[in-house]
Swiss-Prot record:
Keyword list, A-Z: Cobalamin biosynthesis, Glutamine amidotransferase
Domain GATase cobBQ-type: 252-442
Stated family: Belongs to the CobB/CobQ family. CobQ subfamily.
Pathway(s) the chain acts in: Cofactor biosynthesis; adenosylcobalamin biosynthesis
NCBIfam families, sorted: cobQ (TIGR00313), PRK00784.1 (NF001989)
Protein name: Cobyric acid synthase
Lineage: Bacteria, Pseudomonadati, Pseudomonadota, Alphaproteobacteria, Hyphomicrobiales
GO biological process, one term: cobalamin biosynthetic process
Main function: Catalyzes amidations at positions B, D, E, and G on adenosylcobyrinic A,C-diamide. NH(2) groups are provided by glutamine, and one molecule of ATP is hydrogenolyzed for each amidation.
SUPFAM superfamilies associated with the record: Class I glutamine amidotransferase-like, P-loop containing nucleoside triphosphate hydrolases
Amino acid sequence: MARALMFQGTGSDVGKSLLVAGLARAFTLRGLKVRPFKPQNMSNNAAVTADGGEIGRAQALQARAARVPLSVHMNPVLLKPQGETGAQVVVQGRVHGTAKAAAYQGMKPSLLPFVLDSFDRLKAEADLVLVEGAGSASEVNLRTGDIANMGFARAADVPVVVIGDIDRGGVIASLVGTKAVIDAADAALIKGFVVNRFRGDPSLFATGMELIARQTGWAALGLVPHFSEAIRLPAEDALALSAPPAPKPRARTRICVPILPHVSNFDDLDPLDAEPSVEVRRIRPHETLPVDTDLVLLIGSKATIADLAALKAEGLHHDILAFARRGGHVMGLCGGYQMLGETIADPDGIEGEAKIARGLGLLKVHTVLSPEKRLVEVAGVALDPAVAAPFSGYEMHMGVTAGADAEQPFAVLSDGRQDGARSASGRVSGTYVHGLFASDAFRSGLLGALGGAPSQAAYEQGVEETLDRLAAHLAAHLDLDLLFSLAR
């Protein structure tokens, strides 16, 4: 029977996802069959499974670290915020409906059986299941009906390790405070704590570790130094967008990406960020398009019509249209592709009130949103002669796009379908495929077409090497044998 160990945090973004990914690789390298599991995740950064479901992108990275295929059971409840209608609720990989916050609280007890079913399925095929909590373990106001943290741990009888982030300050208060506010039955499941992202001389925090252990009664399981290479791994959620990569003054290619309120699948940017000669600039509200832009890239959105309205409200559409008139290159991915067209119709009110929105008009295509969601892994070849390279990726969208420019498609897919559209000039293009920038040949061809340096990077190989180094980093600062002994 498989063992399981759960990692909860004192708050969001304390490093739970990365720690689970690193431990998944470390225990896998020891010969164990490892499966990652997160009962409930909230993110618009999702990955497609082979059977046409979807899970959080963090669990996809953890599965990769464990060297196993993605499964919808690794993240049985995925919440995808989508504007005025609340959040789309995805259960075991399939859309279950939409709910606003208050309604979802009432829905949670009915979702626990799905969560436990998925957990049991993973345990049946693994030696060790590494469970990640969500947000903070100490949100006692949300404890009733909880399925993400202690509610799940109690229901599944899984021991817990609590993670605190010293980099943001107040880690002693965060950990001791967590013990103070949770009830005794929940606290009984906690076996120890880890202090994450430490910088400096570890001996200077020895008394801090002792104080936390004394105040909580939990075992001090490790002080993990900051892992600077984390930026080489795909980001989990939109918090990463608040800390964009450092400027690259010597970059040969500058790609500008408007950051809109309901941005999704922003991990499409990671392979571009990893290019030494490419600077990906995030364009925030009230900012204008820089004059040295080589490509405007509109990425995915969970509320396309609302984000299109936000783009226009900021006046950034004027910059984009002027840039295109001057011969600039513009590319749209999924929701960004839909925005580039002439109209987006939502007759069924998928994104709220039924309406028709006028797009940017840079592509002669029209989109009709529909309730059916397309989730599929794809491969294909870009048809732009300047790029003409193979790629792989995935589709994740609700809607159909057609029109004159779709007769000059962006790509032909391996199943024979045509995807996307290109303008008559070839300088404006759109595609429904996410993840294509991770394909080295395609990325290199695109950068060359923009007049930049063709890529010499091997992105996927770099992710694998970084996971190996993360595993070694954790193995050097955590007792893996002790952690395994705590699992049950």
